Amino acid sequence: MQVTTITMDDVQYPYRLGTDCLDGIVTRLGELGASRYLIVSDPRVAELYGQGLRERLAEQAGPAELITHASGEQNKGLPALHDLAEEALRRGADRQSIVVALGGGVTGNIAGLLAALLFRGIRLVHVPTTVVAMLDSVLSLKQAVNAGVGKNLVGTFYQPVEVLADTAMLRTLPVREVRSGMCEVVKNSLAIRPSMIDQLSAGLRPDGRYPDDTMHWIIYESLAAKAQVTAYDKYERGEGLILEYGHTVGHAVEHSSQGAVPHGAAVALGMIAAAQVSHRAGWASAELVDLHRELVAKTGVARRIPSDIPLSAVRHRLSFDNKRGYLPASADTYPMVLLESPGKVLRSEGTVLTAAPRDLVDAVVDELAEPPRPAAARTDDAATVLGGAG
């Protein structure tokens, strides 16, 4: 496994990446040593990889427990966290245990918060199994669960001791999740690392099928993009807020969809909305909007908000965005990361945020919505969200 050191201010941890490297993952976990390994996963990943990992750890490293949580963003809340904590304690968790977060962004968040809270902090190792997790969420110290009014509103910052990633695990990932993950790569290219746009544009595949070498390049470019803005901002309150590009409208759409729109696909919609806001406000050209639409289309995800998501719910959740408080409070604006051009972020009040007029953002959200269709013409949620360029 190749090793890259993730550095954020005084925080450092290794990111080990390989392909078909489960042996290496088991060996490394054994080297870390634990009184008990607490593998946290959702049912699908538990069936694919969790049981095998538990058995091999038990044989080669020490006692191991597999603890599952209900899948889906809609289940990433305080009740699920409470249930996991109770189960971990019943299974023998102590201060020398390691929480192994085996899964995607939802698992990583809830397991990360679990590790931060058990005994006021025990060791955390991420074993990401999705594109979003491998190239985005495990590169952050943010660990959070959702509240009823919005996404990722209850949490803390907590450092993993390692990330152990095997791209072979992406082969069993549903296509919709691969497409969704690529939207975070598009975000990195547009907001932080425009030098990768041309190669990324040529390599994006709407069918969601990527060879291992392409996936490795994408992951390493994402590591570099994150490093540009978090190397001196571990809490992502300064330059690191650029990583929130597309997340204002994106989180509102994702949360309002009750899990039907995956995270990356929602962020893609949020980026298109942000580009339109910049253009309509006179801060960016129409070409920036076109570039957003072109790159999003090449990922294979939709470019419109599905018609069955109530726009009133989206607008309501915009008011509870997790960036509130960085700019002076106003009932007439939303704090947003906006671009002037690729890689050039608009700045105000000493931050990378702009107070975007609420009326303009609401209008853009309305225009981004898919036109209502007769019920008989509707497909299932997954096809609607990810079936085409919109």
UniProtKB/Swiss-Prot annotation:
Family annotation (PANTHER family): 3-DEHYDROQUINATE SYNTHASE (PTHR43622:SF1)
Name of the molecule in the record: 2-deoxy-scyllo-inosose synthase
Catalyzed reactions: D-glucose 6-phosphate = 2-deoxy-L-scyllo-inosose + phosphate
GO MF, any single term: 3-dehydroquinate synthase activity
Classification via CDD domains: DOIS
Binding positions for Co(2+) per the UniProt entry: E184, H247, H263
Top EC group: lyase
Residues annotated as the enzyme's active site: K142, E244
Presence of keyword NAD: yes
Entry keyword DNA damage: no
Dependence of activity on temperature: Optimum temperature is 42 degrees Celsius.
UniProt organism field: Streptomyces kanamyceticus
Co-factor: note: Binds 1 Co(2+) ion per subunit.
Region span, Disordered: 371-390
Any one GO BP annotation for this protein: aromatic amino acid family biosynthetic process
Cofactors named for this entry: NAD(+); Co(2+)
Membrane-spanning parts: none
UniProt-listed Enzyme Commission number(s): 4.2.3.124
Sites where the protein binds NAD(+): 42, 73-76, 105-109, 129-130, 140-142, 151-152
